[in-house]
């Protein structure tokens, strides 16, 4: 499982690294608090926000509330659902929301240390026949669009921005922050067996994570990369 990544943004892919023409190779990232891993392991899956109450909440509640009311409808055959009915994965791990969580907000002030990135290859999501779609920006934003056309995904999202370190809005481009938060949304759940990459901020959290995950079995790549956080 050789991967290459853009350290500026945390955009990771198998083989030669992120390529707009090979979205199947992209590794997409769901971050959570290490406290939540026992519940995930017991369930055997990552569950949508609408179906789970985490042990330690890190999400920013105003955004969570918006996601509960954001309709996801990439096409007429997609299940009637809201953004909160999906398991969210960021295409570039160093997302604007990760910045908010690492720096602290009204609901969480624990910093980056206890956070865990769980990585899944988009191709594995597709091969598992899960219902998924991509957002071209923050899935909570009113103007965000959705697609499940994998062949055009590299142009549907802002690929170049997903490779860059800086994502703040500018006068000329007031939606950069949203586009840098492009997501892969998986409807309902993701079997934990699809998680093939685990990234932690420090050794302390990785030791805790390995103690929990090693008995579960499966093949996963474990890395400590503080640069994948803020």
Swiss-Prot record:
Enzyme class: transferase
Molecular-function annotations in GO: DNA binding; glycosyltransferase activity; nucleotidyltransferase activity
Residues annotated as transmembrane: none
Quaternary organization: Interacts with cognate antitoxin DarG (via C-terminus); this heterodimeric complex neutralizes the toxic effect of DarT by preventing ssDNA binding to DarT and consequently inactivating the toxin by direct protein-protein interactions.
EC number: 2.4.2.-
Written domain comment of the UniProt record: The NAD(+)-binding element stabilizes the ADP-ribosylating turn-turn (ARTT) loop which confers substrate specificity; both domains contribute to ssDNA-binding.
Domain DarT: 26-230
Induction / repression: Part of the dnaB-darT-darG operon.
Binding site for NAD(+): 30-32, 39, 47, 67
Disruption phenotype: A double darT-darG deletion shows no change in growth in culture, upon infection of mice or upon exposure to a variety of stresses. Another group finds the double knockout gives a competitive advantage over wild-type cells in liquid culture growth experiments.
Protein name: DNA ADP-ribosyl transferase
S-S pairs: none
Region called ADP-ribosylating turn-turn loop, residue ranges: 135-183
Family assignment from sequence similarity: Belongs to the DarT ADP-ribosyltransferase family.
Active site as annotated: 67, 183
